[in-house]
């Protein structure tokens, strides 16, 4: 069955979508739907099936029914299907980008950039499919000992709303390449691009049941998926609070759980840093995707020798940032993704006004729709290290500025956080930068560069920023399990009967 989802930049409408389960397009079994909202106007786009536990069960069973067949489909065939999917994504990039802009608020130029990168992930894992394997082990005697890396089986992919399509692709690409079957639950606020992606999976020729999409609320469909006893692996990207609940639900049936969670990432400017470059990265750090980025530079640490000059330059640069309609070519920052999240970010801005000094922003941009979820880039200074805006993840275009003079104190302040996802250092002295990087309790450190997600580099957090890694060959561990096989090449009944060395 063929179904086409489309978005139009002028009408801002999309044809009503259906879920994709076992190769078929289906409504929710209950018949229930819910609206998906355009963030730039606050108006409904279309209705989405409101899947529940019964829909999740059908999708998981479909994935389980073909799990063994897919596991033993040769890696070259799996790779060819992923490459065909990459071709289809490239061919449909403009349509995917427009749907992403419409549904999630990404400004169109950025959405295009993200969508055109997705084939890189699919191609990378297509290339890895027939190259990832176990190892041989040297053991005493005339014996052969080796390991196999086997797929987990059915994997659940619970996708966030900030980068819906990219995170979906980076998650399912290794899972499918390594022989797992997938059930995807996109965020309720941003489901349209996942359903368009399902069309392309279908067109690429993946067998029915290998890839499934169930839409619905996290508390209903998402929780049911994480708790399903036939799900052997769970990948979740989102808040630490929700991640804890996903881990609890998955732990009830001992599923392997991979979590990329919250962050309060520092951007550190050293006294010898090239300030123009550092200012540009600081703006990207908390304004990109309207600050709705797990690695957002929401803590800005400025050395006291350059702080005043840096802040002058920062304000000047922020005055050039255009906030507005994602489909307007001049826009550089779009809206927040939902009304609920908009209200949350505005509450944090009010908290910041009580805790610190507002240097820039703090309100709604002018010339934006009244019902859109727009917030100005916002900078607070004179921020105490124990302030809420310095410690809690806001997930909006808000940064807290703190000054520093001692590297030891700087590192202690950065590490005094429940999060440990990411850090950026701007420093010409590479020895000082490397020493600082080694002492930071985070999963990734970029020196004189901004976060650029790539399929070949591992991404993940320390502490309450998550477990496991997405991307890079390190991601293999999130989608496979080890099997050991030992062979005695000179079996002897007498020796076999000797239990002296047998484990107890």
From Swiss-Prot:
Belongs to the aldehyde dehydrogenase family. It is an enzyme of class 1 (oxidoreductase). Involved in the degradation of methyl tert-butyl ether (MTBE). Catalyzes the conversion of hydroxyisobutyraldehyde to hydroxyisobutyric acid (HIBA). Keywords: Cytoplasm, NAD, Oxidoreductase. One of its GO terms (cellular component) is cytoplasm. One of its GO terms (molecular function) is oxidoreductase activity, acting on the aldehyde or oxo group of donors, NAD or NADP as acceptor. Induction: Induced in the presence of MTBE or tert-butyl alcohol (TBA). Coiled coil: none annotated. InterPro entries: Ald_DH/histidinol_DH (IPR016161), Ald_DH_C (IPR016163), Ald_DH_CS_GLU (IPR029510), Ald_DH_N (IPR016162), Aldehyde_DH_dom (IPR015590). This is Hydroxyisobutyraldehyde dehydrogenase. The active site is at 260 (proton acceptor), 294 (nucleophile). Gene3D superfamilies: Aldehyde Dehydrogenase, Chain A, domain 1 (3.40.605.10), Aldehyde Dehydrogenase, Chain A, domain 2 (3.40.309.10). Its EC number is 1.2.1.98. It is found in: Cytoplasm. It catalyses: 2-hydroxy-2-methylpropanal + NAD(+) + H2O = 2-hydroxy-2-methylpropanoate + NADH + 2 H(+).
